[in-house]
Each structure stands twice: as C-alpha cells, then as structure tokens.
Swiss-Prot record:
Belongs to the fluoride channel Fluc/FEX (TC 1.A.43) family. The chain crosses the membrane at residues 2-22, 35-55, 71-91, 100-120. Na(+) binds at residues 75, 78. It comes from the Bacteria. It is found in: Cell inner membrane. Na(+) is not transported, but it plays an essential structural role and its presence is essential for fluoride channel function. The keyword Mitochondrion does not apply. This is Fluoride-specific ion channel FluC. It comes from Proteus mirabilis (strain HI4320).
C-alpha cells in the first residue's frame, strides 16, 4: 500500500508541476480565457486514455506504473476544480459567452483528445 501511495505522490507532483508550467506560460496569452487549464485538461485526457488503452494491451507491465500515470500524473495535471472556478468567475463577471465557450472548449477538447488517443492506439 505504501508503494502505491508513493507512486501516486510522485506522479501527482510531476503532473502538478507540469500543469503550473502550462498555465504560467499560456494564461497570459489570452487574459479572458484560461488557455492553460484547457491545454492541461486536453493533454491529460489524451495521456490517461492512451495509458489505459496501452496498459490493457500490455498486461505484464507492473500495475504501479498505471496508478502512477493515471491517478498520480493525470490527476495532478488535469483540473476540474480550477476549470469550475474559472467558469463560475466568468459567469459572475457577466461574461456569459466566455463562460459557455470555456465550458464547451474544455468538455469537447477533453472528449476529442480521449477519443483520439483510443483511435491512435488502435491504429498502431
């Protein structure tokens, strides 16, 4: 059990740092749109889908790597809570169009990246 907690801790730390770097670099490009959150969520959706599909095809890989990648890394990288706060803040500021656009972009982007990852691994 301790080794699983350590794996989640390491993966989560790495994913969180990557999310911070992405947001740090991208959020200043478009002040009215949280580009960093969108990119982090889409990358995370791709990685977790690709990882789950990959691990299902490679049963000999130690399951600790799966938990480190999915729960740890992708859990640290993706952020539903930040996405929610950003959307509610936009609604509270009266920027309804931006709020709806942010919701649509995050949901559609994440679903599309998930589907793309599954398709890509199937084609490999």
């Amino acid at each position: 059990m301790l080794n699983i907690a350590i794996a989640v801790f390491i993966g989560g730390g790495l994913g969180s740092v990557l999310r911070w770097l992405i947001s740090y670099r991208l959020n200043s490009l478009f002040p009215h749109f949280a580009t960093g959150t969108l990119v982090a969520n889409c990358i995370g959706a791709f990685i977790i889908a690709f990882g789950i599909a990959w691990f299902s095809k490679a049963p000999n890989i130690d399951p600790i790597w799966k938990i480190m990648l999915t729960t740890g890394f992708c859990g640290g990288l993706t952020t539903f809570s930040t996405f929610s706060v950003e959307v509610v803040a936009l609604f509270n500021e009266g920027r309804i169009g931006w709020a709806l656009g942010t919701m649509g972009a995050n949901l559609a982007g994440s679903f599309l990246m998930t589907a793309f990852a599954f398709w890509l691994l199937r084609e490999m």
